[in-house]
Amino acid sequence: MEHWLFYLRAHLLEALGFAQRSITSYQAALRIKPEFHRCSNRIAYILAGLGRYAEAEPYFLTVLAADPGNASAHFNLGYTYDKRGEFEQAIRAFSEATRLHPKLDRAWYGLGLSHAALGQHDRAANALREAATLQPMNPHAWYQLGMAYHTLQDRDKMDAVVMHLLRFDPKITRQLIRDAKRSDLDYLVKDLAA
């Protein structure tokens, strides 16, 4: 029961914004009950949120050793790999997350970004299309999908992305048009203030 007291204290400290103190309390709970993987998951999540990705990794791996079907933990592990530039490992983790939970849009998004970082733009487009389909109002997924199509020199698909994105986020649409150097589409966003 004592491990729960440390867990609840840590949870409160985390909610109040005391990240390091909450980690210390979660670690105390783990010393009492090492198989209390909720604590490992929270520690990993906090460390990743602090940008301490290498420190977060072993905690995510501990969670996954106990619960290999945890799609969110696979996603979070992929995120830590992606942030460290370890894109092949990120792809493996994101792929497992999407296999376990095919509607986990953020895993598809991360998968697309990791493929793009490796220059695998066709695979990136496939993953980003899934992310955009699952979250049709996510301008970042649509922007990245448009850039993947631009890199693949698929003007028709990129134009379709621009037209879709224009309906709900003209500013991101303008950014996509500029970044893709598609001045032929400037007329769509000419009324936006610079």
Locate predicted features.
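Structural signature of tandem alpha-helical TPR/SEL1-like repeats
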Residues: 15-28, 49-62, 69, 83-96, ...
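TPR/TPR-like alpha-solenoid helical repeat scaffolds
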Residues: 146-153, 172-193
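A contiguous binding-surface segment within folded domains or other stable secondary-structure elements
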Residues: 102-126
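Alpha-helical segment of the N-proximal tetratricopeptide repeat
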Residues: 1-28, 38, 42-49
